Amino acid sequence: MWFKNLTVYRFNKPFSVDTEALEKSLEDFTFSPCSSQDISKFGFSNALGKQGQTLVHSASERHLICATKEEKILPSQVIKEALEDKVAQIEAEEDRKLAKKEKDAMKEEIVMTLLPRAFTRRSQIRALIIPEIEMILVDSSSAAKSEELLALLRKALGSLPIIPLSFKTPIETQLTEWLKGNSTPAPFIMQDEAELKTDSDEGGIVRFKQQDLTEDEVLAHIEVGKQVHKLALYFGQSIAFLLQSDAGIKRLKFSEEFRAGNDEVGTEDPMARLDADFALMGSELIALMNSLVEVLGGVEDSI
């Protein structure tokens, strides 16, 4: 339930699909396990996992969705060795060298033979659609995995007018100014971790962890042209996270004190607790994103 990373997108046009329509749209793209000849399968699953019964979980017009991916595990070395053995056998029997086209066809046959016996692994990825702030927050640090989920959502809805979150002023410019001035705008508080680098490909990268970022050693790197591309921050007393210059948020962690706000709900009714946690998390993520947009100078205008 509690998101651990954020890859953020914003809508170009208002999102006006209600819960019922969204649920119906996702139904045609629900997850099903791999058959014997499938390499992978990807589809929407219950938003709240085993406790849930719907593909969309909504509260206060915030929509949680989840997609499941199942992949067959076929080690490349196993395929390579099987192919080499098969090629060697045929070339010896026929006294000729096989063409690349023949080898490629042989490789496909080997893969299809191995698929029914292959182990599988599953992974899930969730996203929170928040029309209130015109954003989609994907619980992933991978842009590729986020795009895979959003491509499936776009296919289900017919269209999905979104772009990656970006700001009018480069994030690294703002973070560098904060570090130079040893000051972050409220309610953000600087932690003890940062990554600095130059804009040129030849420039170096320096990382600081568990270190006072106001020390001369850190500031000296800024003086010679490096900029802050990653900075660990606190959002008040509720969230710790690592902000990146590409607007990605990693290592998102809600404090124990904040999560304890739902302790009175108890755990006797799992669905009630999940509902409460979803509401608590959603409200705080909205507050976080609104505050980030404000202190980072506003989002970049849509093209």
Curated annotation (Swiss-Prot):
Task: Specify the superkingdom.
Answer: Bacteria
Its subcellular locations are: Cytoplasm, Nucleoid
Pfam families for the chain: RdgC (PF04381)
Listed A to Z, the keywords are: Cytoplasm, DNA recombination
InterPro entries hit by this protein: RdgC (IPR007476)
Q: Which GO terms describe its molecular function?
A: double-stranded DNA binding
**What is one cellular component GO term in this UniProt entry?**
bacterial nucleoid
* Keyword Chloroplast carried by entry: no
Thylakoid listed as a keyword = no
Q: Name one GO biological process term.
A: regulation of DNA recombination
Matches recorded under PANTHER family: RECOMBINATION-ASSOCIATED PROTEIN RDGC (PTHR38103:SF1)
Identify its protein family.
Answer: Belongs to the RdgC family.
Function description: May be involved in recombination.
The protein's name is: Recombination-associated protein RdgC
Organism encoding this protein? Shewanella sediminis (strain HAW-EB3)
Top-level taxonomy: Bacteria, Pseudomonadati, Pseudomonadota, Gammaproteobacteria, Alteromonadales
